[in-house]
């Protein structure tokens, strides 16, 4: 299952939900305003 907003993400964790992406700096699922 994917993770929602403000959830931990990364190489060893589940992917973020649709419309979200993993922040490369803080390793959280964040909104992607460009998509």
Swiss-Prot record:
Tissue: Expressed by the venom gland.
Gene Ontology MF term list: ion channel inhibitor activity; toxin activity
Principal cellular location given in the protein's record: secreted
Family the UniProt entry places it in: Belongs to the neurotoxin 10 (Hwtx-1) family. 49 (Jztx-F6) subfamily.
Compartments where found: Secreted
UniProt keyword Disulfide bond, yes or no: yes
Domain remarks: The presence of a 'disulfide through disulfide knot' structurally defines this protein as a knottin.
Family annotation (SUPFAM superfamilies): omega toxin-like
Family annotation (Pfam families): Toxin_12 (PF07740)
Purpose of the protein: Probable ion channel inhibitor.
GO CC annotations on file: extracellular region
SS bonds (residue pairs): 2-17, 9-22, 16-29
Descriptive protein name: Jingzhaotoxin F6-27.63
Domain of life of the source: Eukaryota
Keywords: Disulfide bond, Ion channel impairing toxin, Knottin, Secreted, Toxin
